[in-house]
Amino acid sequence: MPADAARLATAFATTPPLVVLTSNRTREVHDAHKRRCLYHWLQHPDFDREVAILRRRLPDVTEQLAREVARATAKLRTLDLLKPPGVAEAMDWATALHTLGARELDPDVAARTLGAVLKYREDTDRVHAMARGALFGGG
């Protein structure tokens, strides 16, 4: 036993702890573990909520850019992608765009920064093959 560990006291919880496990379903969870869990499925936030999240977490990102990123991310989620983007990817994308000095999400800058929001090459290739304007143009 290390000398430092001998000085530490053992802590006991006065009430049973509440443990929250999250999963993006990238790995299978063993059946024995699943039987001991309660499940609550979360949906992606609606447009206004996602814009609010982006603005709160990334205050330097303009309202317009936050709205365009939220709109484009919602459109990407409707596609048959291996990994549809979540809020974390939307935040990564908005951060990358802001860092590059983008004031709006036009089709060209969107195409150049897809790696921030799409994590699989097949997804990026699929989006590049589509009409970019339909995904990243205005409303």
Tell me what each language-model feature is.
Residues M1-G139:
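C-terminal regulatory/interaction module of P-loop NTP-utilizing enzymes
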